[in-house]
UniProtKB/Swiss-Prot annotation:
It holds the Pfam family DNAPolymera_Pol. It comes from Gallid herpesvirus 2 (strain Chicken/Md5/ATCC VR-987). GO terms for biological process: DNA-templated DNA replication; viral DNA genome replication. GO terms for molecular function: DNA binding; DNA-directed DNA polymerase activity; nucleotide binding; RNA-DNA hybrid ribonuclease activity. This is DNA polymerase catalytic subunit.
């Protein structure tokens, strides 16, 4: 669709005016000064954010043309003028930095290489805080006028610069450029000399340079290296020396000679590790320059305070002139590492700013009810709300609303907003989508918030904005972070490869914390929509506005658009409250600081990288080096894996290489996570309802404590038995059988485990931090609590770090040994308890204070279950109060008698009633009244509220009603077959009453609370990646796509209900069958009518199918809102069966885990009802069957006729001989 040049566009303040339009190809805009159009290249001070435009692509809904005529459709064309916005009736050319000081808040004073700093601006400061870093490679030829000689020398012919971004104590934004960083890797000297024939470091440097030159045109990413400097790279680009180091793998590896190859460019390191004699093992070639700088310098941190000092030889720092700034910061400093002092102990935060934003979109195609898609030109962003907070004070400082067209916020909303936050929202209005998006990006650049949050912004908001600007408007975004060009501003979609677990968004100098991801981690809910999360976490509900209502509201004029604006701002307000409730920035920054990784990596890059960098730092201090992952280190002790294997932590996605780790080094197979050893031991449970006290002993930090106690590590694992010749078994090394393979680990006095050192230091640090919490003020206590939680998270990642064969530094033998020792410990505890506490006298000898709590009945003790790191001990004849008071002493006694430190048992809890079902499934009440459940269906997120409600009512009765509990204990004592033919104890009558109530509720025809019956399941990967597409939540996904509804993204939970098999449901299931496999995820604007246009079906109408044509349950899955809107009945048979199934899984322990008998017994409580099936009656009549009537009210002759028919029928049946 093109725009007629004579068309006018309506603006509420200046009325209709004619715009000069030209339909020329391409956009005419400039991204800054110093652009050489002839040679199509930029100089050293160029920028890639937009500063001037004289023509742009114009996309705007036609409903904005005239406030009286509501047109459908979208204008698409070219508009020749500068982009403008309207604020309070005034027009502003917002790219004109000088004239738009009051349009929105700004923290940027350098724009388009011009300084707008105050005349009295003082660049001096004492300390600065760093929150993000970026690595770049620059050339001396491009810095001649900018840098002093000492920095130029570090760039000849090229050099790596690490830019640290942060803020000073006095609130100035600063970028510190650290010169002289040389990333490096190692190669074993003897192997290198033998394979490549080098005789000295200089000769090796020549060979390295040759490989770089010859490889430039062969590697897939050759364009990154194709510069004149690269083609003429020489040996001077490399610094090679010989050092003494030890390989971290295996005991017996002593100091050996290694070549350390330093390069002036990290890109060369990556290229050489791939292409320089692949048979030579490279060590630490996957470590980037930022990590090198932080780990190689004591006191340096990726998140923390720094100050400057005079260099080792008296060198001083250099302040860059504003015209040479490469970032949007107020101050830029050149320095080297010897000019920096770190303050890792200072945990204070400067006044960082938080942006909380939300976007609203509308479809502009034929079907305006469709959900918008970013690649469709006509689907536009119509509003963006922006709330700006101070992270330190948690105060809302500014509120902006970017709106397409005139927008009048409701007066009551503005008054409430001002009374609550003491500010008014600023509304900025635009004529076209491009102007709105460009203004938003310009605001982002000029305000430069350090932190950004929103709800599902990674998967939708950022993704929509980035896709729209790059595909529809062909804009570069690399200059819209803190750096002015060649920065990162990118979205990674979740599910694009088998490792990535969630979407990513990374922008240089802008840390994104998506509260959707935080909510899914912190809360257990059936749905993670913002409304549900806000109610659960804040006790607040949002004002609902369906995206289907947005087109009509938008077209209705400024007042209705104001309602959309209120909705948009309200979403951001709720997200801001969630952010300061869960304060995710504190814990994640503590993890980043502890692990020595960037905050963005702590957020998006998984668990493996955290342990890897910590181990790298420690290994360096002990003279060890880490090889790039080799398949031999991931060899497994067995290819079998038990059902109850311990879950291993996910490892990092190769989609964006971690520390420049190559994808090939991560993926040795197509099997995803490879777990090649037997999992943690689980002692078989004695199922049933236990009303005697059950004490639970838990191992504190089981796997970390095993690693410490037994000195397990890469460095202590004996790979060559000849290294044991001078060592004594058991005294000098541990020998353990792991699934038939004999493994040996030397003791600490021979060589101390690096993993054990790490864990010991971390746990000591955590203990010290926790000791400070009670003495600290509330604000400091929260910070300390997040720090200790961060340490716990990293500690628990160590075992998984070793156990993932596709991980960064795998050692399956270590992980397998840990689980084997854990299994043996459970068995040892069980045998100890049965032997040492087996009689009343033995128990009282050990713990005489229990004598006052002994009951008259017979005493017994037994271990009824063992679950990885827990032991369940049942005591009969002992009062629970005595066990509670003595439990800690009992746990300490077992620990001291059986295990070396730091392994210890703790008395975690004592059950007074316990329903032990199967492995990893139990529920019970702890002394004190609190109920605890694990693995039980009623707490699963994909159960509906109806089932959860009644299952909870029944479980409450079982544990809180002593009459029911006594009756249930009686049931559990007898064999299941007894209850198949015998009446249940009367004490279970109230139990049956709840079941009858559930049945009665399902039989009510006017069910309106559909949400009570909604279930949910996660869309774990893209729909086309599912092998089985006939599953309920995927069926709903396809139905939403067919109806052009809003489509869930990967990792979203999809809600669904099971509908009755009405004609409409049958029809839609057939359409879904045709639709499957041919889904175009962005084909939203088809001619499909809105759901509201569907033909209504009477809710009493059902369709019967022959068995061969019977619908699957998954085919009857439906979107809850669609079901309610179209008056489709629920499938009551399914829900009753599902309720009974859930109850059977939970309460089968009462009947010896016999599911069939459990269901038979539970069905006794459901009232029998008769529902006449007309179609069945007609079918029977057609087969010559006759109808008879009986009962009160029949006439004498009719009753007599009935008796005669029955007499004949039963006589015939009696006379017919049995033929089988």
């Amino acid at each position: 669709m093109s725009v007629d040049g004579t068309k006018t566009f309506f603006n509420p303040y200046i009325g209709a005016r004619k715009r000069s339009l030209e339909a020329r190809n391409g956009l005419s805009f400039s991204t800054g000064q110093n652009y050489d159009e002839k040679n199509n290249r930029r100089d050293r001070n160029s920028i890639t954010y937009v500063t001037t435009i004289d023509e742009f692509k114009y996309i705007a809904p036609k409903c904005l043309d005239d406030k009286d005529v509501k047109q459908k459709g979208t204008h698409i064309g070219k508009l020749k003028r500068s982009p403008v916005l309207y604020k309070n009736g005034e027009e502003y050319v917002f790219l004109n930095f000088e004239d738009c000081e009051d349009v929105w808040p700004r923290r940027c004073s350098i724009w388009n290489n011009r300084s707008f700093l105050p005349a009295d601006f003082d660049p001096r400061f004492s300390r600065f805080h760093v929150y993000d870093m970026i690595e770049t490679v620059e050339f001396a030829s491009a810095a001649i006028d900018r840098d002093k000689n000492r920095f130029l020398e570090l760039l000849r012919p090229m050099g790596t610069i690490v830019t640290m971004m942060g803020i000073t104590e006095c609130g100035k934004r600063v970028a510190v450029h650290v010169y002289g960083i040389k990333p490096y890797f190692y190669m074993r000297k003897v192997d290198t000399d033998t394979i490549c024939g080098s005789r000295c470091p200089r000769e090796l440097a020549e060979k390295l340079a040759n490989v770089v030159r010859s490889s430039v045109n062969e590697v897939a990413n050759a364009k990154r290296f194709c510069t004149p400097v690269t083609r003429t790279v020489s040996a001077d680009c490399f610094e090679v020396d010989v050092v003494q180091r030890k390989d971290i793998y295996y005991y017996g590896t002593g100091h050996d000679e290694f070549y350390r190859v330093k390069s002036q460019s990290g890109k060369f390191i990556t290229l050489l590790c791939d292409n320089f004699y692949p048979s030579i093992i490279k060590y630490e070639g996957n470590i980037d320059a930022i990590t090198r700088m932080v780990l190689d310098n004591n006191g340096f941190s990726t998140f923390g305070w720094y100050s400057f000092k005079v260099g080792n030889n008296g060198e001083k720092v250099q302040v860059r002139a504003p015209c040479h700034h490469c970032t949007s910061c107020d101050i830029e400093i050149n320095c080297t590492v010897d000019n920096l002092i770190g303050y890792p102990e200072d945990d204070a935060w400067p006044d960082y700013k938080l942006l909380c934003f939300d976007i609203e979109c509308k479809s502009g195609g034929v079907n305006e009810c469709a959900f918008p898609c970013a690649t469709n030109e006509e689907d536009v962003v119509i509003q963006i709300s922006c709330l700006l907070y101070s992270i330190n004070t948690k105060q809302l400082e500014h509120a902006l609303l970017f709106a397409l067209g005139a927008c009048d916020l409701p007066q009551t909303f503005k008054e409430t907003f001002q009374s609550s936050y003491n500010i008014l929202p600023i509304v900025l209005e635009f004529d076209s989508e491009f102007e709105l998006l460009l203004a938003f990006m310009t605001f982002i650049k000029q305000y430069a918030p350090e932190f950004v949050t929103g709800y599902n912004i990674v998967n939708f908001d950022w993704a929509f904005i980035v896709t729209k600007l790059t595909t529809v408007y062909n804009m570069r975004l690399d200059g819209y972070g803190v750096v002015n060009q060649k920065g990162m501003f990118k979205v990674w979609d979740a599910g694009t490869n088998r490792f990535q677990k969630k979407g990513k968004f990374k922008a240089t100098g802008m840390i994104t914390l998506d509260m959707y991801s935080i909510a899914t981690e912190k809360l257990k809910l059936q749905s993670y929509k913002l409304d549900v999360v806000a109610e659960a976490a804040l006790g607040e509900r949002k004002k609902e506005l369906s995206y289907k209502e947005i087109p009509s509201h938008f077209a209705a004029g400024p007042e209705k658009r104001g309602i959309i604006g209120e909705y948009c701002l309200q979403d951001s307000l709720l997200v801001g409250k969630l952010f300061f409730k869960y304060i995710p920035h504190l814990e994640l920054s503590a993890i980043a600081k502890l692990a020595g990784i960037l905050l963005s990596k702590a957020i998006f890059d998984g668990q493996q990288i955290r342990v890897y960098t910590c181990l790298l730092r420690l290994a360096r201090s002990h003279g060890f080096i880490l090889p790039e992952k080799n398949k031999k280190f991931a060899e497994t002790v067995s290819l079998t894996c038990e059902e109850d294997q311990t879950e291993i932590c996910e490892h990092d996605s190769p989609q964006e290489p971690i520390h420049n780790i190559k994808q090939s080094s991560l993926c040795h197979s197509n099997s995803g996570r490879t777990i090649g050893y037997q999992g943690a031991k689980v002692l078989d449970p004695i199922s049933g309802f236990h009303v005697d006290p059950v004490m639970v002993f838990d191992f504190a930090s089981l796997y970390p404590s095993i690693i410490q106690a037994h000195n397990l590590c890469f460095t202590t694992l004996v790979h060559d038995d000849t290294n044991l010749s001078n060592l004594r078994p058991q005294d000098d090394y541990l020998e353990i059988n792991v699934q038939g393979k004999l493994l040996r680990f030397v003791k600490p006095h021979i060589r101390e485990s690096l993993l054990a050192i790490l864990l010991k230091d971390w746990l000591a640090m955590r203990k010290a931090i926790r000791a400070k919490i009670p003495e600290s003020c509330d604000e400091i206590a929260v910070l300390l609590d997040k720090q200790q939680a961060a340490i716990k998270v990293v500690c628990n990642s160590v075992y998984g770090f070793c156990g993932v064969s596709n991980g960064l530094l795998p050692c399956i033998d270590v992980a397998a040994t840990v689980t084997t020792i854990g299994r043996n410990m459970l068995l040892t505890v069980r045998d100890y308890i049965h032997k040492q506490w087996g009689t009343r006298d033995a128990l009282l000898r050990e713990f005489p204070n229990l004598s006052n709590f002994m009951r008259p009945e017979d005493y017994s003790v037994s271990v009824i279950y063992g679950d990885t790191d827990s032991v369940f001990i049942k005591f009969k004849g002992v009062d629970i109060h005595g066990l509670v008071t003595t439990g800690d002493d009992m746990a300490k006694r077992v620990s001291s008698d059986l295990f070396p430190k730091p392994i210890k048992l703790e008395c975690e809890k004592t059950f007074n009633k316990l329903l032990l079902i199967t492995k990893k499934k139990y529920m019970g009440t702890i002394h004190g009244g609190r109920m605890l459940m694990k693995g039980v269906d009623i707490v699963r997120k994909n159960n509906c509220r109806f089932i959860n409600t009644y299952a909870k009512k029944l479980s409450d009765l079982l544990f809180l009603d002593d009459t029911v509990a006594k009756a249930a204990a009686t049931v559990a004592e007898k064999p299941p077959s007894f209850w198949a033919t015998s009446p249940l104890p009367e004490g279970l009558n109230s139990f049956g009453g709840v079941l009858a109530e559930a049945y009665t509720r399902m039989m009510i025809n006017n069910i309106t609370e559909v949400e009570d019956f909604a279930m949910s399941a996660e869309l774990s990967r893209p729909p086309d990646a599912y092998t089985n597409k006939r599953i309920p939540h995927l069926t709903v996904y396809y139905k939403l796509a067919m109806r052009s509804e809003q489509l869930p993204v990967v990792k979203d939970r999809i809600s669904y209900v099971i509908a009755a098999a009405t004609p409409e449901v049958v029809r839609d299931s057939a359409r879904v069958a045709e639709f499957r496999g041919e889904l175009d995820l962005c084909h939203q604007n088809s001619n499909t009518s809105c759901p509201g246009d569907s033909v209504m079906t009477n809710k009493e109408t059902y369709v019967r199918h022959s068995p061969r044509n019977k619908l699957l349950i998954s085919d009857m899955a439906e979107d809850p809102k669609y079901l309610l809107a179209n008056n489709i009945p629920l499938n009551t048979d399914y829900y009753l069966s599902h309720l009974l199934g859930t109850l059977c899984v939970t309460f089968k322990a009462l009947f010896g885990n016999d599911v069939k008998i459990t269901e038979t017994v539970l069905r006794r409580f459901i009232p029998e009802t008769f529902t006449e099936d007309c179609s069945y009656t007609e079918r029977v009549s057609s087969e010559m069957f006759t109808t008879i009537r009986s009962g009160i009210g029949l006439q004498v002759n009719e009753e007599e006729e009935t008796r005669r028919k029955l007499n004949i029928a039963f006589r015939i049946l009696t006379a017919t001989p049995h033929r089988y």
